[in-house]
Regions:
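N-terminal pre-triad scaffold of radical SAM enzymes
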Residues: 1-20, 47-62, 68
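Canonical radical SAM enzyme core domain
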Residues: 24-44, 67-112, 118-125, 133-139, ...
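Short, electropositive alpha-helical surface patch
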Residues: 76-81, 167-185, 242-259
Length: 317
């Protein structure tokens, strides 16, 4: 799965952003010609460094900064679609530009396009405290409505909740907002924050552990998992920290192998092949006391044989 950044700058200042401030100063490297060269190199077999998941060849993940800020954004998407007509384009975006109706209608012409937008709070105060941009919540709400209004067959929308200290107590309200105002969204993904760059710089406001998340939200996850069904997903959670087995079918692998680590208890775990792994920097800030080996669970689960790479557990018996 190639991973390509279209723009390094961003007009949000999220407290847990995985990019450094210095990264935003490399805008000169994101012209259409520069990006075209990278795409062409990949197609010619010289772009292995763009791979996030080397075993998934054709889907493209489009990142930034904020990629929709690139003046040549639609020109780049058109070129990607021309060169890879069967590939899914997975777009990571803060969603602000989708508040513009013309922009959203133009997006609706792109085939096989999956949009991922983050929701950080349940209202303007809680959301904008994290993104640090005034009116961002209003823009996101309008943007989501526009995406749902204009999307065509072959397009889908994923709303992502990135858990960190500043919103860990609001997840129930955030799920309720989605359920009430955006009931037709295709997937709702809850992601454990990665300890990288801005998240580390703002550790006082972002730090949390798996144990804290599950203590406060296990019942919340169970409740909304029942309501959302298969659309509900948990990302970046190791199996052993999620004690309630009813949640296991909602857990997905989304980190590439080079960003995953395992601790000493993992070495003796009889169910490691079903685990999502631990983000590589997590133990540096939380230690490894949360993790424990599991007995063999193969007799009590049904694997997802069609998508085991990303979704190892289909159901629990």
């Amino acid at each position: 799965m190639p991973d390509i950044a279209l723009w390094s700058a961003c007009d949000h200042r999220c407290v847990m952003c995985s990019n450094s401030f210095e990264y935003a100063s490399t805008i000169r490297d994101y012209s259409f010609d520069s990006i075209k060269k990278r795409i062409d190199a990949y197609k010619d077999g010289n772009g292995f460094s763009m791979h996030r998941f080397p075993d998934v060849e054709w889907d493209w993940t489009i990142t930034g900064g904020e990629p929709t800020l690139n003046p040549d954004y639609f020109k780049i998407l058109s070129y990607l679609r021309e060169q890879f007509p069967k590939s899914k384009l997975v777009q990571l975006t803060h969603g602000d530009n989708f508040a513009d109706d013309d922009f959203s209608q133009k997006i609706a012409t792109i085939e096989n396009y999956h949009i991922c937008v983050p929701l950080h709070g349940f209202n303007a105060e809680t959301h904008e405290a994290i993104v640090r941009k005034k009116w961002a919540f209003q823009l996101l709400m309008r943007g989501i409505l526009n995406i749902l209004k204009h999307r065509k067959s072959g397009q889908s929308l994923e709303i992502r909740l990135i858990i960190q200290k500043m919103n860990i107590d609001y997840l129930d309200k955030m799920y309720y907002l989605i359920h009430k105002f955006f009931p037709t969204v295709d997937s709702i993904s809850t992601i454990m924050m990665e300890f990288e760059w801005q998240a580390i710089d703002n550790l006082k406001n972002t730090h949390l552990s798996y144990t804290e998340v599950m203590k406060k939200n296990e019942s919340v996850f169970l409740k909304w998992g029942e309501i959302f069904g298969e659309r509900f997903r948990l990302y970046h959670f190791p199996l052993c920290v999620v004690k309630n087995k009813k949640l296991w079918p909602y857990m997905w692998r989304t980190l590439p192998a080079h960003e995953i680590t395992f601790t000493k208890p993992c070495m003796d775990c009889k169910s490691w092949k079903y685990c999502m792994g631990i983000h590589e920097a997590y133990t540096e800030f939380n230690g490894n006391k949360e993790f424990s080996e599991l007995e063999d669970i193969s007799h009590s689960i049904t694997p997802d044989s069609k998508n085991f790479r990303f979704h190892p557990i289909q159901s629990v018996m």
